[in-house]
């Protein structure tokens, strides 16, 4: 009987519960970078003396590449970045808040269809012919470069798949799969120069976004991780500021696809 009690006690000491076996009550934070792709978009501009739409506009992101700006607090908004803080409400589900700092740059010098009217047509090197014009910089520059800020809340599920790879100790190395959905506001700083007006570049709540994601999480030594995500979503901005006058505005909606890689930590308080 004494031997049995000793054996049981020894097994308890030798096989403590792993930190990675349960997630409920844990906090996490991560910081990383992203690349984006965007669908074509119709952009509607309106003001006191103009009201026109340009169709099937294409755009690209503006990556910084590998750079120390990702680590410089004074310059962290220059690259395309992701910041997220979350809390596990169960072993599998967590809620989080975050900012996806994307960048959106309209391609200039491309021929597009348009409709509507604006003053002094033909004087901005846009060469309007029929229902087409050229997106010359004298006519329009349009960027959400500081940035296309998606401030959002997500609910995500996390599942440990380490057993599929026969990993012996998840407290040393663990692989998780994660998926989630999100909703939030668009708070862009839109850099616009329109019809010869002064450039405008100020933060403004412009609309909303919806998103869904799937990703892989690689956790090392309990507390540190690398996370990769593929996130897609829909953005609808119906109140984009384009000049210092509140009479001037734009609206657009489009789909986006983000590729994210981030580093972070997970802990209990």
What are these regions (language model features)?
Residues 23-27, 77-81, 145-151, 173-175, ...:
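Residues that define the transmembrane beta-barrel architecture of outer-membrane proteins
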Residues 41-44, 50-51, 215, 219-269:
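Predominantly the C-terminal beta-signal and adjacent terminal strand-loop region
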Residues 41-47, 108-114, 167-168, 188-198, ...:
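Outer-membrane beta-barrel translocator domains and adjoining extracellular loop/strand segments
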Residues 83, 153-155, 210-214, 230, ...:
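Membrane-embedded beta-strands of outer-membrane beta-barrel proteins
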Residues 18, 22-25, 84-192, 264-267:
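Gram-negative (and chloroplast) outer-membrane scaffold detector with strong preference
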Residues 15-17, 68-71, 137-143, 194-203, ...:
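Extracellular loop and loop/strand-boundary signature of outer-membrane beta-barrel proteins
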Residues 9-87, 188-190, 258-268:
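Short glycine/proline- and aromatic-enriched beta-strand/turn motifs that initiate or cap beta-hairpins
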Residues 57-66, 128-137, 189-197, 242-245:
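Flexible, solvent-exposed coil segments and beta strand-coil junctions
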């Amino acid at each position: 009987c004494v031997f049995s009690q000793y054996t049981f006690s020894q097994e308890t000491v030798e096989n403590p519960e792993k930190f990675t076996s349960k997630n409920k009550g844990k906090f996490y934070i991560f910081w990383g970078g992203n690349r984006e792709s965007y669908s074509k978009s119709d952009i509607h501009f309106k003001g006191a003396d103009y009201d026109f739409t340009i169709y099937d506009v294409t755009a690209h992101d503006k990556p910084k590449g590998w750079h120390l700006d990702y680590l410089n607090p004074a310059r962290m908004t220059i690259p395309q970045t992701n910041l997220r803080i979350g809390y596990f409400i169960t072993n599998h589900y967590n809620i989080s808040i975050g900012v996806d700092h994307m960048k959106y740059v309209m391609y200039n010098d491309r021929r597009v269809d348009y409709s509507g009217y604006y003053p002094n047509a033909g004087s901005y090197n846009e060469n309007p012919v029929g229902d087409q014009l050229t997106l010359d910089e004298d006519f329009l520059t349009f960027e959400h470069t500081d940035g296309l800020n998606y401030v959002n809340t997500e609910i995500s599920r996390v599942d440990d798949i380490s057993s599929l790879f026969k990993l012996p100790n998840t407290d040393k190395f663990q692989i998780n799969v994660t998926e989630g959905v999100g909703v939030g506001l668009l708070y862009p700083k839109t850099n616009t120069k329109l019809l010869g007006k002064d450039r405008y570049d100020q933060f403004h709540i412009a609309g909303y976004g919806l998103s869904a994601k799937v990703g892989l999480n690689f956790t090392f030594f309990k507390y540190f991780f690398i996370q990769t995500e593929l996130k897609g979503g829909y953005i609808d901005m119906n109140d984009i500021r384009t000049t210092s006058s509140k009479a001037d505005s734009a609206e657009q909606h489009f789909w986006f696809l983000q590729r994210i890689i981030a580093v972070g930590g997970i802990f209990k308080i």
